[in-house]
């Protein structure tokens, strides 16, 4: 066992040769390197698989022995300064390593087909492999300096992948937004690290925790300064894990390829912030009020992310806000001191969210055959619907991921989320009410995404698809009512069903309206995709290839069964509790991990009832209302009610505007921060040019002007200069005489 731990340092470096060799190959032998590009993808998967096997071996030993292994190399510069590097293997490291490798392998396999038509195929795999290396280095770090180094590398890889299609202005802007937002958090993290080093004199976790606990117990530190340093450390996690108010980069990050969205949201960048707080938990729990602050940020993020997901039309952005909300649950659990629940939900959510993102990628891939390559169209749920019979495997897998995130037993997320919800009652009733109500919102918006995507009819066929937004059908509201802003107010469904010659086809017509053959020219392509140019596009979507379906099918058993790892039916069977021994749990300090069946059943019924209510509301609003003639009277009755629905419409429109405009946080930043910084820069420029430079320039100009006047008066004659000279001397002598008289 000791020998296995000794070679654990190789974990983060095994995937590293792939990006290095790809980079050298593209520089020195570009043609040959591109000709064997599938071989590089195979090597990426192979090396990451070796890391996964090694991580699983370490995890088995962790479960059996609950040991912690740390190895440190010291580089002594002089008697006062030494640099220490090492690796730390504990339960948190082994859990994160398995999570990163399993999700990473499946995403790489999926990407082989998804990115096969992209000219940046090799560049993508180089970034992905380096991303895995950086994240593995982060979770195995034994001190804060290594944490910060790999933290920055993780951020760099995410920026490269978010802006992977950098020729698209929106992708380049999203990359810049992620970079600037995370700069704020990373700067806080750096200041926090330096602050705690100044207090304790150590970067190593063990020494840092021990020294700091002694200082706190002896009351030898300034609590205000310590709290400030802790908040700065936590700021790094806020930005990385997209917590309020530094969450604004996450939805825009969906401009990157879908596989990287799955990796970022499941096992890498956003998980890094949760990992950091979990790693520093022994530090945070002894600082007054910092745990309360963490839980406060978590509960705000939970509710904020859920409300922002309610009206998203982009399928990936809807899932992105879902990730934000679920990360808020994890942060809430950490703030409550429920360490096990937070990591449990991190595991279950990772596999469910990876399944959902890969499923959404399959949907987008199939929609591109209809609308051409244009993310605004292929990712727009308004144009989807009715995909059940076209992509049945994707549909069923997406449904499982949706039900898991909704909290339906016995799927994975039910067990972990239910544990967090139950713990929230012990911590704060107010937080518990918000968390439980948000669970209902989660079920609502996830079911909404599923219904808009897969149920009903294929909406893209119900208009003369030319990219214009002036057709009535394009404005089908996502709130279950007609879109009055764009649609004709006198438009009725009966009229729609009668249109067969001059308008869009009937929902029940066997005739299929042909799409514009030049739809691919609406957006300037930045990658070359066969069949997406000026050629005719397909009339119906089709299921993805086996290479893309295989990872989706692999994630299904994870979504079904990974939750059973943490079910405390019996102390000997609860693998997660044994894995995390010793664990931090401030809410159940004397717990013996045995389940109270009555409490469990009561809480489970309540939790499932709330989720079922959210699903029912979503089904009522977003069910395929055009699927039968029986719905015609119902819809027209809603339309005819007129003024009676004005108040409820105002409420729904307010909620819709809040959600669709991202809670106005982006507008606030744009108005006050961006404009404020620009105004400050303009004022600084004015002050520098007019005041700072104006004073010496003014003195110089006055001196030059006086000299020119004197020069013009003198006329260039020596006799004139002598006359003025003696005149001034005489004047000064007279003044001196009268002053001393």
UniProtKB/Swiss-Prot annotation:
NDH is composed of at least 16 different subunits, 5 of which are encoded in the nucleus. Belongs to the complex I subunit 5 family. It is found in: Plastid, Chloroplast thylakoid membrane. NDH shuttles electrons from NAD(P)H:plastoquinone, via FMN and iron-sulfur (Fe-S) centers, to quinones in the photosynthetic chain and possibly in a chloroplast respiratory chain. The immediate electron acceptor for the enzyme in this species is believed to be plastoquinone. Couples the redox reaction to proton translocation, and thus conserves the redox energy in a proton gradient. InterPro entries: NADH_UbQ_OxRdtase_chlpt_su5_C, NADHpl_OxRdtase_5_subgr, ND/Mrp_TM, NU5C-like, Proton_antipo_N. It catalyses: a plastoquinone + NADH + (n+1) H(+)(in) = a plastoquinol + NAD(+) + n H(+)(out); a plastoquinone + NADPH + (n+1) H(+)(in) = a plastoquinol + NADP(+) + n H(+)(out). Its main location: plastid. The keyword Transmembrane helix applies. GO terms for biological process: ATP synthesis coupled electron transport; electron transport coupled proton transport. This is NAD(P)H-quinone oxidoreductase subunit 5, chloroplastic. It is a multi-pass membrane protein. The gene is ndhF. GO terms for molecular function: NADH dehydrogenase (ubiquinone) activity; quinone binding.
């Amino acid at each position: 066992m000791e020998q296995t731990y000794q070679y654990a340092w190789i974990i983060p470096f095994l995937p590293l040769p792939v990006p290095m060799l790809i980079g050298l190959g593209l520089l020195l032998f570009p043609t040959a390197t591109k000709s064997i590009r599938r071989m590089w993808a195979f090597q990426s998967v192979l090396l990451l698989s070796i890391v996964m096997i090694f991580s699983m071996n370490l995890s088995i030993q962790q479960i059996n022995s609950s040991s912690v292994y740390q190895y440190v190399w010291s580089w002594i510069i002089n008697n006062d300064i030494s640099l220490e590097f090492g690796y730390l293997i504990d339960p948190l490291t082994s859990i994160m390593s398995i999570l990163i490798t399993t999700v990473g392998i499946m995403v790489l396999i999926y990407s082989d087909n998804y990115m096969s038509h992209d000219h940046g195929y090799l560049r993508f795999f180089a970034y992905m492999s380096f991303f895995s290396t950086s994240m593995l280095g982060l979770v195995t770090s034994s001190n804060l300096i290594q944490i910060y180094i790999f933290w920055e590398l993780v951020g760099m890889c995410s920026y490269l992948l978010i802006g992977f299609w950098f020729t698209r202005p929106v992708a380049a802007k999203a990359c810049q937004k992620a970079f600037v937002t995370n700069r704020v958090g990373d700067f806080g993290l750096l200041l926090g690290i330096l602050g705690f080093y100044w207090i304790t004199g150590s970067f190593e976790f063990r020494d840092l925790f021990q020294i700091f606990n002694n200082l706190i117990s002896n009351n030898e530190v300034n609590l205000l300064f310590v709290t400030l340093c802790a908040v700065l450390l936590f700021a790094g996690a806020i930005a990385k894990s997209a917590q309020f108010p530094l969450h604004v980069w996450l939805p825009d990050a969906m401009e990157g390829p879908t596989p990287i969205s799955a990796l970022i949201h499941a096992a890498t960048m956003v998980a890094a912030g949760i990992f950091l707080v979990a790693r520093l938990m022994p530090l945070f729990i002894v600082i007054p009020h910092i745990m309360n602050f963490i839980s406060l940020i978590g509960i705000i993020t939970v509710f904020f992310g859920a409300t922002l997901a309610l009206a998203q039309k982009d399928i990936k952005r809807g899932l992105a806000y879902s990730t934000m909300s679920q990360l808020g649950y994890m942060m809430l659990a950490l703030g409550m001191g429920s360490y096990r629940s937070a990591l449990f939900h991190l595991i279950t959510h990772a596999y469910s969210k990876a399944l959902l993102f890969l499923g959404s990628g399959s949907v987008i891939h199939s929609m591109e055959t209809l609308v051409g390559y244009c993310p605004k169209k292929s990712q727009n749920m308004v144009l989807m619907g009715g995909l059940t019979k076209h992509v049945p495997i994707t549909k069923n897998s997406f449904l499982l991921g949706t039900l898991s995130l909704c909290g339906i037993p016995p799927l994975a997320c039910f067990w972990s989320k239910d544990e967090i919800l139950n713990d929230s009652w012990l911590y704060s009733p107010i937080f518990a009410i918000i968390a439980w109500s948000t669970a209902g919102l989660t079920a609502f918006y996830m079911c909404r995404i599923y219904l808009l995507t897969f149920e009903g009819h294929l909406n893209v066929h119900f208009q003369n698809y030319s990219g214009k937004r002036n057709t009535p059908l394009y404005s089908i509201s996502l709130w279950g009512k007609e879109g009055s802003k764009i649609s004709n107010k006198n438009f009725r469904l009966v009229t729609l069903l009668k249109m067969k010659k001059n308008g869009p086809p009937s929902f029940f017509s066997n005739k299929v309206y042909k799409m514009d053959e030049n739809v691919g020219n609406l957006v300037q392509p930045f990658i070359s995709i066969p069949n997406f140019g000026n050629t005719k596009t397909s009339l119906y979507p089709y299921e993805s290839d086996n290479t893309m379906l295989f990872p989706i099918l692999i994630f299904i058993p994870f979504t079904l069964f990974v939750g059973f790892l943490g079910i405390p039916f019996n102390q000997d069977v609860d693998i997660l509790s044994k894995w995390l021994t010793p664990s931090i749990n401030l809410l159940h300090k004397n717990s013996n991990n045995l389940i109270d069946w009555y409490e469990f059943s009561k809480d489970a019924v309540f939790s499932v009832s709330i989720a079922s209510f959210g699903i029912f509301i979503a089904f009522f609003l977003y069910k395929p209302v055009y699927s039968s003639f029986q719905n015609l009277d119902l819809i027209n009755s809603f339309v005819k009610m007129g003024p009676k629905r004005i108040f409820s419409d105002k409420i729904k429109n307010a909620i819709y505007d809040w959600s669709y405009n991202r809670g106005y946080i982006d507008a606030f930043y744009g108005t006050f921060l961006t404009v404020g910084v620009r105004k400050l820069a303009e004022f600084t420029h004015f002050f520098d040019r007019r005041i700072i430079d104006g004073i010496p320039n003014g003195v110089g100009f006055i001196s030059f002007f006086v000299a020119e006047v004197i020069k013009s008066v003198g006329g260039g004659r020596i006799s004139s200069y002598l006359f003025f000279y003696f005149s001034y001397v005489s004047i000064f002598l007279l003044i001196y005489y009268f002053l001393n008289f």
